[in-house]
Design a protein with these regions (language model features):
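Short, glycine-/small- and polar/acidic-enriched structural segments
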Residues: 6-11, 25, 29-164, 169-172, ...
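Hydrophobic membrane-insertion alpha-helices, especially the h-region
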Residues: 12-24
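Extracytoplasmic/secreted envelope proteins and their assembly/folding machinery
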Residues: 49-52, 80, 95, 120, ...
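Short, solvent-exposed loop/beta-turn-alpha elements that line the ligand-binding surface or hinge
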Residues: 63, 213-216, 283-290
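Pocket-lining segment of extracytoplasmic ligand-binding domains
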Residues: 170-171, 176-264
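Secondary-structure end/capping motifs
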Residues: 231-308
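Conserved C-terminal helix/tail region of periplasmic/extracytoplasmic solute-binding proteins
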Residues: 302-331
Length: 331
């Protein structure tokens, strides 16, 4: 009897030890998963940021072992400022923001462009102002956002129209002031990006003229970070780009579902998303066209007196290893 009890007691102890060990292992596994470093990304609240919203919604970041938090910001400038102050690890920003920030400091790295548009900016006037051609802006007031894609686009339209020396008054406004200023006829035209074009068309009683030139300016939205983060990030940026590429593939296959998702995330009507959707080209890239665009805008900024330094070497701003690694792993 004692032998039988000892055997069963020993068996029970083995089972207990195995059970406790399994429980401890499971708890350790959960704890380890919880300790995966959080990756914070400042994302501009615009349809241009669609790959990030899709990757988040579809769980694509998690598929690549990333614990990503998207922090919304009102513009590429504010996203970049969050990144430069170390409040986020990555940010989305236009090439204009990258260009201006690179004049100010040398700790910005560009990993890839994820969307382009040659029709996102527009030069708008209202029919009652009797301005239907760029030349009719002579002596008029044009609302622009100083030192931004808005101002660069307006100057590019003047040059493209062979009217570089046109006498026109630039009225510098904040983004939120542009549409109200045009609707109140405080300015005769505005150089604005979407969704401001949609808002003018929606809110204006009068018909709207687009005086701009499609294709004169190529907008890109880009993923940027800091050397101090990337130095210790390992393959995190590569996995981040892989998730974004999967999101872009999904966007191309499901445009209507993407617009519905964006409408919900941005809390805007689907019609607003659809307004400029066909102008967006979603793709990951990091090449000479973006480099040339940065160099062109840098020369414009110097000639316009917006910066006083000589232009930075934008080749040093490109951080191409994660992008090249992502391509290699997909081939």
């Amino acid at each position: 009897m004692q032998v039988w009890l000892k055997k069963h007691w020993a068996s029970g102890m083995v089972i207990l030890v195995l059970t406790v060990s399994a429980l401890l292992f499971y708890q350790h596994k959960i704890r380890t998963e919880d300790l995966v470093d959080e990756t914070k990304i400042g994302v501009s609240l615009t349809p241009l940021s669609a790959p990030f919203f899709v990757a988040d919604q579809m769980g694509l970041f998690k598929q690549y072992g990333l614990n990503v938090s998207l922090l919304p910001c009102s513009s590429g400038v504010s996203c970049a400022d969050l990144m430069l102050s170390s409040d986020v690890d990555y940010a989305t920003a236009s090439e204009s923001v990258v260009m201006f920030k690179s004049f100010q400091r040398d700790d910005i790295l560009l990993l890839a462009s994820f969307v382009e548009s040659d029709n996102d900016l527009k030069l708008l006037s209202l029919v009652p102002s009797k301005i239907s051609r760029v030349a009719q802006l002579e002596g008029k007031r044009v609302g622009v956002i100083k030192g931004s894609a808005s101002e660069f686009y307006f100057d590019s339209v003047l040059i493209g129209s062979n009217l570089r020396d046109l006498r026109v008054e630039k009225v510098y406004l904040q983004p939120k002031e542009l549409v109200p200023a045009l609707l109140a006829y405080n300015v005769d035209a505005i150089s604005a990006w979407e969704p401001m074009g949609f808002q003018v068309d929606l809110l204006s009683v009068a018909r709207v003229h687009n005086l701009g030139i499609e294709g004169v300016y190529q907008l890109s939205f880009n993923l940027i970070s800091r050397p101090s983060h990337l130095e210790f990030a390992g393959d995190e940026p590569t996995r981040l780009l892989q998730a974004l590429q999967d999101a872009i593939d999904w966007i191309k296959a499901h445009p209507d579902q993407t617009m519905t998702l964006l409408s919900q995330r941005l809390e805007v009507p689907v019609e607003q998303i659809d307004w400029s959707w066909d102008d967006y080209v979603f793709r990951l890239s990091l090449g000479n066209s973006l480099l040339s665009n940065l160099q062109l805008q840098a020369r414009w900024a110097i000639d316009s007196g917006l910066v006083s330094k000589s232009p930075p070497d934008f080749r040093r701003v490109f951080y191409s290893h994660p992008y090249q690694q992502m391509l290699a792993e997909r081939n």
